[in-house]
Amino acid sequence: MKRDALSALGLASHVAARLADRSRARQVREALEAGQLDVHYQPKIELRSQRVSGVEALVRWRHPTRGLLAPAAFLPTDEHDGPMVELTAHVLDVAIGQAAEWRRRGVSLSVAVNISAASVADERLAGTIDALLRRFDVPARQLVLEITETAVLRDPEGCAELLHEIAGAGVSISLDDFGTGQSSLSRLLRLPIHELKLDREFVRAMSAGHDKDRLVHAILTFAHDLGHRVVAEGVEDRAMLDRLADLGCDEAQGYYICRPLPADELPDWVLRPRGAADRLFSRPLGAGAWEKPFRAPAVAWR
Protein backbone atom coordinates (compact mmCIF):
# COMPACT_ATOMS: atom_id res chain seq x y z
CA MET A 1 0.00 0.00 0.00
CA LYS A 2 2.78 2.43 0.99
CA ARG A 3 4.73 1.58 -2.17
CA ASP A 4 1.64 2.21 -4.33
CA ALA A 5 1.11 5.58 -2.64
CA LEU A 6 4.73 6.58 -3.25
CA SER A 7 4.47 5.51 -6.90
CA ALA A 8 1.31 7.55 -7.34
CA LEU A 9 2.97 10.56 -5.72
CA GLY A 10 5.99 10.21 -8.00
CA LEU A 11 3.77 9.98 -11.08
CA ALA A 12 1.80 13.04 -9.99
CA SER A 13 5.02 15.01 -9.49
CA HIS A 14 6.25 13.98 -12.94
CA VAL A 15 2.97 15.00 -14.58
CA ALA A 16 3.00 18.33 -12.74
CA ALA A 17 6.58 19.00 -13.89
CA ARG A 18 5.69 18.18 -17.50
CA LEU A 19 2.67 20.48 -17.39
CA ALA A 20 4.80 23.27 -15.91
CA ASP A 21 7.39 22.80 -18.67
CA ARG A 22 4.72 22.97 -21.36
CA SER A 23 3.37 26.17 -19.82
CA ARG A 24 6.84 27.68 -19.75
CA ALA A 25 7.50 26.63 -23.34
CA ARG A 26 4.30 28.34 -24.43
CA GLN A 27 5.28 31.50 -22.55
CA VAL A 28 8.74 31.54 -24.14
CA ARG A 29 7.20 31.25 -27.59
CA GLU A 30 4.82 34.11 -26.83
CA ALA A 31 7.67 36.25 -25.45
CA LEU A 32 9.72 35.59 -28.59
CA GLU A 33 6.84 36.62 -30.81
CA ALA A 34 6.24 39.75 -28.71
CA GLY A 35 9.91 40.80 -28.86
CA GLN A 36 10.22 40.71 -25.06
CA LEU A 37 13.41 38.62 -24.81
CA ASP A 38 16.59 40.65 -24.40
CA VAL A 39 20.22 39.55 -24.18
CA HIS A 40 22.49 40.81 -21.40
CA TYR A 41 26.24 40.21 -21.24
CA GLN A 42 28.37 39.20 -18.26
CA PRO A 43 32.09 40.02 -18.56
CA LYS A 44 34.79 37.43 -17.94
CA ILE A 45 38.34 38.30 -16.92
CA GLU A 46 41.60 36.52 -17.61
CA LEU A 47 43.15 36.03 -14.20
CA ARG A 48 46.83 36.24 -15.16
CA SER A 49 46.59 39.43 -17.23
CA GLN A 50 43.56 40.84 -15.38
CA ARG A 51 42.06 41.78 -18.74
CA VAL A 52 38.52 41.42 -19.99
CA SER A 53 38.64 38.23 -22.05
CA GLY A 54 35.05 38.05 -23.28
CA VAL A 55 31.40 37.99 -22.28
CA GLU A 56 28.66 35.42 -21.85
CA ALA A 57 25.32 36.18 -23.52
CA LEU A 58 22.43 35.61 -21.10
CA VAL A 59 18.77 35.86 -22.09
CA ARG A 60 16.39 37.99 -20.02
CA TRP A 61 12.61 38.34 -20.28
CA ARG A 62 11.14 41.84 -19.98
CA HIS A 63 7.90 40.56 -18.48
CA PRO A 64 5.06 43.11 -18.75
CA THR A 65 4.06 42.70 -15.09
CA ARG A 66 6.88 40.82 -13.32
CA GLY A 67 9.80 42.91 -14.55
CA LEU A 68 13.15 41.55 -15.77
CA LEU A 69 13.34 37.77 -15.35
CA ALA A 70 16.41 35.52 -15.39
CA PRO A 71 16.28 32.20 -17.31
CA ALA A 72 15.56 30.09 -14.22
CA ALA A 73 12.25 31.92 -13.83
CA PHE A 74 10.87 31.10 -17.27
CA LEU A 75 12.81 28.51 -19.30
CA PRO A 76 11.59 24.88 -19.42
CA THR A 77 13.70 22.49 -17.35
CA ASP A 78 13.72 20.06 -20.29
CA GLU A 79 15.79 21.77 -23.00
CA HIS A 80 14.19 19.58 -25.65
CA ASP A 81 10.80 21.17 -24.97
CA GLY A 82 9.05 23.75 -27.09
CA PRO A 83 10.82 26.61 -28.83
CA MET A 84 14.37 26.05 -27.52
CA VAL A 85 15.84 25.80 -31.03
CA GLU A 86 14.16 29.09 -31.96
CA LEU A 87 15.32 30.71 -28.72
CA THR A 88 18.92 29.60 -29.27
CA ALA A 89 18.83 30.94 -32.83
CA HIS A 90 17.46 34.25 -31.52
CA VAL A 91 20.25 34.62 -28.94
CA LEU A 92 22.90 33.70 -31.53
CA ASP A 93 21.50 36.31 -33.92
CA VAL A 94 21.42 39.05 -31.28
CA ALA A 95 24.80 38.19 -29.72
CA ILE A 96 26.73 37.90 -32.98
CA GLY A 97 25.14 41.09 -34.26
CA GLN A 98 26.09 42.83 -31.01
CA ALA A 99 29.68 41.59 -31.28
CA ALA A 100 29.85 43.23 -34.71
CA GLU A 101 28.50 46.50 -33.28
CA TRP A 102 31.06 46.48 -30.47
CA ARG A 103 33.85 45.87 -32.99
CA ARG A 104 32.78 49.02 -34.82
CA ARG A 105 33.11 50.86 -31.49
CA GLY A 106 36.59 49.51 -30.87
CA VAL A 107 35.66 46.77 -28.40
CA SER A 108 36.52 43.31 -29.75
CA LEU A 109 35.35 40.64 -27.34
CA SER A 110 34.64 36.94 -27.67
CA VAL A 111 30.98 36.18 -27.05
CA ALA A 112 29.85 32.91 -25.46
CA VAL A 113 26.34 31.65 -26.21
CA ASN A 114 24.59 28.81 -24.39
CA ILE A 115 23.38 26.17 -26.84
CA SER A 116 20.29 24.23 -25.80
CA ALA A 117 20.19 20.43 -25.93
CA ALA A 118 17.60 20.65 -28.69
CA SER A 119 19.92 22.83 -30.78
CA VAL A 120 22.88 20.47 -30.29
CA ALA A 121 20.66 17.79 -31.83
CA ASP A 122 19.67 20.09 -34.72
CA GLU A 123 21.73 19.41 -37.85
CA ARG A 124 20.98 22.95 -39.06
CA LEU A 125 23.03 24.53 -36.26
CA ALA A 126 26.34 24.65 -38.15
CA GLY A 127 24.70 26.30 -41.15
CA THR A 128 22.87 28.81 -38.94
CA ILE A 129 26.11 29.84 -37.23
CA ASP A 130 28.04 30.11 -40.50
CA ALA A 131 25.31 32.28 -42.04
CA LEU A 132 25.23 34.63 -39.02
CA LEU A 133 29.01 35.03 -38.90
CA ARG A 134 29.05 35.87 -42.61
CA ARG A 135 26.07 38.20 -42.35
CA PHE A 136 27.61 40.27 -39.56
CA ASP A 137 31.23 39.84 -40.74
CA VAL A 138 32.36 38.50 -37.36
CA PRO A 139 35.42 36.19 -37.18
CA ALA A 140 34.58 32.64 -36.10
CA ARG A 141 37.23 32.83 -33.36
CA GLN A 142 35.12 35.52 -31.66
CA LEU A 143 32.27 33.06 -30.97
CA VAL A 144 32.19 30.48 -28.18
CA LEU A 145 29.44 27.86 -27.92
CA GLU A 146 28.65 26.62 -24.42
CA ILE A 147 27.17 23.12 -24.24
CA THR A 148 26.34 20.97 -21.22
CA GLU A 149 27.21 17.34 -20.58
CA THR A 150 23.48 16.63 -20.50
CA ALA A 151 23.10 17.95 -24.04
CA VAL A 152 25.71 15.45 -25.25
CA LEU A 153 24.14 12.40 -23.61
CA ARG A 154 21.11 11.92 -25.86
CA ASP A 155 23.13 11.44 -29.07
CA PRO A 156 26.88 11.44 -28.30
CA GLU A 157 28.04 10.43 -31.78
CA GLY A 158 25.79 12.87 -33.63
CA CYS A 159 26.73 15.65 -31.22
CA ALA A 160 30.44 14.98 -31.69
CA GLU A 161 30.10 15.07 -35.48
CA LEU A 162 28.22 18.38 -35.40
CA LEU A 163 30.63 20.00 -32.95
CA HIS A 164 33.66 18.89 -34.96
CA GLU A 165 32.12 20.57 -38.01
CA ILE A 166 31.54 23.81 -36.09
CA ALA A 167 34.95 23.75 -34.39
CA GLY A 168 36.59 23.08 -37.74
CA ALA A 169 35.28 26.45 -38.92
CA GLY A 170 37.10 28.20 -36.06
CA VAL A 171 34.37 28.46 -33.40
CA SER A 172 35.42 27.55 -29.84
CA ILE A 173 33.52 24.93 -27.84
CA SER A 174 33.08 25.24 -24.08
CA LEU A 175 31.77 22.47 -21.81
CA ASP A 176 29.45 24.19 -19.33
CA ASP A 177 28.75 23.07 -15.74
CA PHE A 178 31.65 20.62 -15.88
CA GLY A 179 31.49 17.93 -13.22
CA THR A 180 27.73 17.99 -12.72
CA GLY A 181 26.71 15.63 -15.53
CA GLN A 182 26.86 11.87 -16.01
CA SER A 183 28.88 11.66 -19.21
CA SER A 184 31.99 9.48 -19.20
CA LEU A 185 35.41 11.08 -19.59
CA SER A 186 36.16 8.88 -22.60
CA ARG A 187 33.07 10.28 -24.32
CA LEU A 188 34.01 13.86 -23.49
CA LEU A 189 37.53 13.34 -24.81
CA ARG A 190 36.05 12.68 -28.26
CA LEU A 191 34.55 16.18 -28.36
CA PRO A 192 36.47 19.16 -29.79
CA ILE A 193 36.45 21.05 -26.48
CA HIS A 194 38.57 24.16 -26.00
CA GLU A 195 37.57 25.09 -22.46
CA LEU A 196 35.78 23.78 -19.38
CA LYS A 197 33.49 25.91 -17.24
CA LEU A 198 33.88 25.09 -13.57
CA ASP A 199 30.40 24.87 -12.07
CA ARG A 200 29.53 27.50 -9.47
CA GLU A 201 28.91 24.80 -6.85
CA PHE A 202 32.59 23.83 -6.98
CA VAL A 203 33.59 27.48 -6.68
CA ARG A 204 31.32 28.10 -3.69
CA ALA A 205 32.47 24.91 -2.00
CA MET A 206 36.08 26.08 -1.92
CA SER A 207 35.33 28.16 1.17
CA ALA A 208 34.08 25.03 2.96
CA GLY A 209 37.50 23.47 3.42
CA HIS A 210 40.84 22.38 2.02
CA ASP A 211 39.43 19.18 0.48
CA LYS A 212 37.29 21.27 -1.87
CA ASP A 213 40.36 23.26 -2.89
CA ARG A 214 42.11 20.03 -3.77
CA LEU A 215 39.15 18.94 -5.90
CA VAL A 216 39.21 22.22 -7.84
CA HIS A 217 42.98 21.93 -8.23
CA ALA A 218 42.56 18.39 -9.59
CA ILE A 219 40.01 19.58 -12.15
CA LEU A 220 42.31 22.42 -13.23
CA THR A 221 45.25 20.04 -13.59
CA PHE A 222 43.15 17.58 -15.59
CA ALA A 223 41.91 20.31 -17.93
CA HIS A 224 45.32 21.89 -18.44
CA ASP A 225 46.93 18.51 -19.14
CA LEU A 226 44.40 18.13 -21.98
CA GLY A 227 45.18 21.62 -23.27
CA HIS A 228 41.86 23.15 -22.15
CA ARG A 229 41.35 26.51 -20.50
CA VAL A 230 39.15 26.71 -17.42
CA VAL A 231 36.56 29.39 -16.65
CA ALA A 232 35.16 29.62 -13.12
CA GLU A 233 31.61 30.93 -12.86
CA GLY A 234 29.69 32.23 -9.88
CA VAL A 235 32.57 34.18 -8.29
CA GLU A 236 30.92 36.11 -5.48
CA ASP A 237 33.75 37.64 -3.45
CA ARG A 238 37.41 38.59 -3.44
CA ALA A 239 38.48 35.51 -1.47
CA MET A 240 37.07 33.23 -4.19
CA LEU A 241 38.85 35.18 -6.92
CA ASP A 242 42.17 35.20 -5.06
CA ARG A 243 41.98 31.45 -4.42
CA LEU A 244 41.13 30.65 -8.04
CA ALA A 245 44.12 32.71 -9.13
CA ASP A 246 46.35 30.86 -6.65
CA LEU A 247 45.14 27.52 -8.02
CA GLY A 248 45.89 28.50 -11.62
CA CYS A 249 42.39 29.04 -13.03
CA ASP A 250 42.46 30.83 -16.39
CA GLU A 251 39.33 33.00 -16.37
CA ALA A 252 36.46 33.92 -14.06
CA GLN A 253 33.07 35.54 -14.07
CA GLY A 254 30.47 36.36 -11.44
CA TYR A 255 28.65 39.16 -9.68
CA TYR A 256 31.78 40.13 -7.74
CA ILE A 257 33.41 41.03 -11.05
CA CYS A 258 30.34 42.40 -12.83
CA ARG A 259 26.65 41.62 -13.10
CA PRO A 260 25.18 40.88 -16.56
CA LEU A 261 24.84 44.19 -18.39
CA PRO A 262 22.59 45.43 -21.19
CA ALA A 263 24.49 45.66 -24.46
CA ASP A 264 24.65 49.45 -24.47
CA GLU A 265 26.24 49.58 -20.99
CA LEU A 266 29.04 47.09 -21.64
CA PRO A 267 31.49 49.27 -23.65
CA ASP A 268 31.51 51.94 -20.92
CA TRP A 269 32.25 49.30 -18.28
CA VAL A 270 35.03 47.76 -20.38
CA LEU A 271 36.69 51.02 -21.37
CA ARG A 272 36.36 53.12 -18.21
CA PRO A 273 39.67 53.74 -16.38
CA ARG A 274 40.20 51.70 -13.24
CA GLY A 275 41.81 53.06 -10.09
CA ALA A 276 42.74 51.57 -6.74
CA ALA A 277 39.09 51.46 -5.70
CA ASP A 278 38.40 49.03 -8.54
CA ARG A 279 41.08 46.53 -7.52
CA LEU A 280 39.52 43.06 -7.66
CA PHE A 281 42.42 41.11 -6.19
CA SER A 282 43.48 41.66 -2.60
CA ARG A 283 47.23 41.31 -3.12
CA PRO A 284 49.98 40.72 -5.69
CA LEU A 285 50.25 36.99 -6.41
CA GLY A 286 52.97 34.93 -8.00
CA ALA A 287 55.97 36.09 -9.98
CA GLY A 288 54.73 39.49 -11.04
CA ALA A 289 51.36 38.22 -12.19
CA TRP A 290 49.33 40.68 -10.12
CA GLU A 291 51.52 43.76 -10.03
CA LYS A 292 48.78 46.16 -11.13
CA PRO A 293 45.10 46.76 -10.39
CA PHE A 294 42.58 45.07 -12.69
CA ARG A 295 42.70 46.85 -16.03
CA ALA A 296 39.53 46.45 -18.02
CA PRO A 297 40.56 48.72 -20.94
CA ALA A 298 43.05 46.13 -22.21
CA VAL A 299 40.74 43.79 -24.12
CA ALA A 300 42.16 40.34 -24.80
CA TRP A 301 41.23 37.57 -27.19
CA ARG A 302 40.61 34.10 -25.81
Give short role names for the model-derived ranges:
Residues 2-138, 151, 302:
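Bacterial c-di-GMP phosphodiesterase EAL domain
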Residues 75-76, 128-132, 161-164, 190-192, ...:
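Glycine-rich, phosphate-binding/catalytic loops in enzymes
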Residues 84, 99, 163, 185-188:
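AlphaC helix (C-helix) of the protein kinase catalytic domain N-lobe
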Residues 99-103, 133-134, 160-168, 217-224, ...:
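Surface-exposed amphipathic alpha-helices with a cationic face
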